[in-house]
Amino acid sequence: MKFFIVLLAALALFTPAFGKTFTRCSLAKEVYALGVPKSELPQWTCIAEHGSSYRTNVVGPTNSNGSNDYGIFQINNYYWCQPANGRFSYNECKLSCNDLLTDNISNSVKCARKIKSQQGWTAWSTWKYCSGSLPSINDCF
């Protein structure tokens, strides 16, 4: 019996975090609750849909410059967050990239809004899928 309890405890400690998967509407509601205007919700849901499939724990494949993109909005670690491996980053959002991989998306939203204010929607490579038609969020509220 002790072995079984120890085994369960060990599995609980070493089980990888799977992150949260939002739906279009659950993401729209959460982002709105974090202060994003309703008029921007279609853009944010589109970026999340095409960048991470609405998943919080996604680390994208390595880019041509050796960087990676993190979290639900696929935020780049060369410019915006500090990677755990200590590699150089401008870290404009002043946070660890791991902070963008949690179920609490407040850091992701704050950083993404900073990116948008400095570079616009085209900062996201997935914007090409959004610029012509955006998902409706009318049925979400």
Curated annotation (Swiss-Prot):
GO molecular function: lysozyme activity
Short name of any one Pfam family annotated for the protein: Lys
Record GO cellular component, one term: extracellular region
Zinc in keyword set: no
Glycan-carrying positions: 65, 104
UniProt xrefs under PROSITE patterns: GLYCOSYL_HYDROL_F22_1, GLYCOSYL_HYDROL_F22_2
SUPFAM superfamilies: Lysozyme-like (SSF53955)
Top-level taxon of origin: Eukaryota
Cellular compartments annotated: Secreted
Domain C-type lysozyme: from-to ranges: 20-141
Main location: secreted
Keywords attached to this entry: Antimicrobial, Disulfide bond, Glycoprotein, Secreted, Signal
Tissue: Expressed only in the midgut where it is restricted to the first half in all larval stages. Expression initiates at the base of the caeca, proceeds throughout the first half of the midgut and gradually stops at the middle of the midgut.
Signal peptide: 1-19
Disulphide-bridged cysteine pairs: 25-140, 46-130, 81-97, 93-111
Family: Belongs to the glycosyl hydrolase 22 family.
Function: Shows antibacterial activity against Gram-positive bacterium M.luteus but shows no activity against Gram-negative bacterium E.coli. Likely to play a role in the eradication of ingested pathogens during their passage through the intestine.
PANTHER family linked: GEO02684P1-RELATED, LYSOZYME C
Name by which UniProt lists this protein: Inactive lysozyme 1A
Native source species: Lucilia sericata (Green bottle fly)
Lineage: Eukaryota, Metazoa, Ecdysozoa, Arthropoda, Hexapoda
